[in-house]
Design a protein with these regions (language model features):
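Carbohydrate-binding/catalytic loop surfaces
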Residues: 25-38, 85-104, 159-179, 226-239, ...
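Short, glycine/acidic-rich hinge or "gate" loops at secondary-structure transitions
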Residues: 18-27, 133-135, 153-162, 200-207
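Secretory-pathway/luminal and periplasmic proteins that interact with or process carbohydrate-rich
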Residues: 10-20, 34-40, 61, 74-79, ...
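Short, small-residue-biased leader/transition segments that mark boundaries at the very start
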Residues: 4-5
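Acidic/histidine-rich catalytic neighborhood
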Residues: 143-197
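Active-site core of glycosidic bond-cleaving carbohydrate-active enzymes
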Residues: 42-78, 82, 98, 105-131, ...
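Long, K/E/R/D-enriched contiguous segments that form extended
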Residues: 17-46, 50-53
Length: 327
């Protein structure tokens, strides 16, 4: 319908060829001090911009984002690598706010490197371009895994967890937060899949298999039947925070599914329902995708109709329009 046409037009107009990736406002801005500096927010926004790319057959529009990530991640001595070096880790990491020059600032967001890599893998999954996987995606995915090899620590149960992490954009910093665990799990799983495609079987892959076997997957059911957001702090029922960071495994990742384990799907439903339906446009779009994954078409449709209210915004936001296409 009309929203699909709008979404496709925005994608085609803001991300193709040798351009920079689509930012918070696509590429359209008419002021010197735009909201959030018209940057690349790594904790949902730039990723959500590209959710529709493959599923709407606009795969070529992915190129600017993939180029941006691979270039900055592998740039010797670049700002993303410097973030990792400050923590005595290989690889790279980013903060929440990032710009076209590779600058990264405001609140470190380590799991974003794993999240970005899921996009690199998704592009291969849709295109089956083995040359792209070998030359572009694999080098980034490998060094990102190495970052987490250096970063993860063993908890009291002998599982590997990400220390001192957050759940955007609220709550405490703890070890083993669901947001980080679920994304690192996806990274390791998809990197092993890439290794299988490329027939890579070396010391790195052996270490990856060993780490993956001990990795906490971030799926734990709490006292009121929900997917837990934190390990130590008890989740607050009725918390309407707009981020759904503890449900990364539901969407955009796929560890949670009724086809895999009904218990986790039901717990995800409890957690998602607790967030409520009211939110910003981009958050509502994310909820549409999550409810669709949980096979609740009526709830997804109701939220989608709310998200289509284009008169209810004060800032042009690309992710509002992109997020409603889920699969």
């Amino acid at each position: 319908g009309s929203e699909m046409c709008i979404r496709d037009s925005l994608m085609l107009g803001s991300s193709r060829g040798g351009q920079l990736p689509s930012n918070l406002q696509g590429l359209w801005n008419n002021v010197n001090n735009p909201a959030w500096e018209c940057d690349y927010h790594s904790n949902i926004n730039v990723q959500m911009n590209y959710w529709p790319a493959e599923v709407t057959n606009l795969s070529e529009c992915y190129a600017p984002f993939i180029t941006y990530v691979s270039t900055e991640a592998l740039k010797d001595g670049g700002s993303w690598q410097q973030v990792a070096r400050k923590e005595n880790c290989r690889g790279w990491a980013v903060h929440t706010q990032n710009n076209i020059f590779g600058y990264t600032d405001w609140l470190i967001n380590r799991p974003a490197n794993a999240w970005y890599c899921t996009h690199l893998w998704q592009h291969y999954a849709y295109t089956l371009n083995k040359e792209y996987l070998r030359d572009t995606a694999w080098p980034v995915m490998k060094v990102t895994c190495q970052y987490w090899f250096d970063r993860l620590k063993e908890n009291a149960e002998g599982r590997l967890v990400a220390p001192n992490e957050w759940s955007p954009e609220h709550g405490p910093w703890e070890d083993g937060v669901a947001y980080a665990q679920q994304l690192v799990y996806a990274l390791f799983e998809e990197t092993l899949a890439a290794a299988d495609v490329l027939a890579v079987d070396d010391a790195f892959v052996s270490e990856l298999k060993e780490k993956f076997s001990r990795l906490d997957n971030g799926l734990h059911i709490g006292s009121w039947g929900q997917i837990k957001e934190w390990t130590i702090q008890e989740d607050k029922q009725g918390d309407h925070q707009r981020h759904l960071s503890h449900l990364m495994a539901l969407y955009p990742c796929d560890q949670i599914s009724y086809l895999k384990d009904k218990r986790y799907a039901e717990a995800a439903k409890v957690a998602l329902d607790s967030r409520g339906d009211g939110a910003t446009g981009w958050s509502r779009a994310w909820k549409v995708a999550c409810w669709a994954r949980l096979w609740d078409g009526e709830r997804a449709y109701r939220l989608l109709k709310q998200a289509q209210n284009i008169t209810d915004v004060t800032v042009v936001s690309m992710d509002d329009n992109a997020g409603g296409v889920y699969e």
